[in-house]
Design a protein with these regions (language model features):
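Enzymes that bind and transform nitrogen-containing heteroaromatic metabolites
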Residues: 1-159
Length: 159
């Protein structure tokens, strides 16, 4: 299982259910990388999707303890149930939000992290993989600048 997330310099990922600074290059990378895959997403993150619509060209699994019905999403009540539902799928990505990342990180072996080199007001953070002994930065796929903000798309793998 893999995950994909954009983080700021302090590993912040969001504020009040949204990304304070969203780069179009990161969104393009997200779409390209997750297309045709299964995505596991939390209820609050789905609430930030336009019209709460499922992501196109992906199997969408909603991870929620609540009995939530959202058209286009399959419901899993636990990380283990989400894993069982996606067993056999070629690629499975955890796409947030903060609670889902924390629950699913121990089950992931690879992480695509877009490091956005700035800070923004955040109330949600991703664990700093540079400080975790069981994760290693293996590759930088892309570096760039957008609207005066530099970024790096990095790959981390579990040791």
């Amino acid at each position: 299982m893999e995950l994909i997330v954009a983080v700021y310099d302090d590993w912040g990922i969001g504020c009040e259910g949204d990304q304070p600074i969203a780069l179009s290059a990161d969104r393009k990378f997200f779409r390209k990388t997750t297309a045709g895959s299964t995505v596991i997403v939390g209820r609050k993150t789905v609430g930030s999707f336009p019209g709460q619509a499922p992501l196109p060209k992906r199997r969408n699994i909603l991870l929620s303890r609540q009995d939530t019905t959202i058209p286009g999403f399959e419901l899993a009540h636990s990380p283990e149930e989400a894993m069982e539902m996606s067993r056999g799928d070629a690629r499975v990505f955890v796409i947030g939000g903060g609670t889902v990342y924390r629950q699913m990180l121990p089950m992931c072996d690879k992480a695509y992290i877009t490091k956005v080199h700035t800070t923004a007001p955040c109330d949600t953070w991703f664990p700093n993989l540079d400080e975790l002994e069981d994760w290693v930065l293996t590759e930088t796929l892309e570096s760039g600048e957008e609207s005066g903000i530099t970024y790096d798309v990095c790959v981390y793998e579990r040791k």
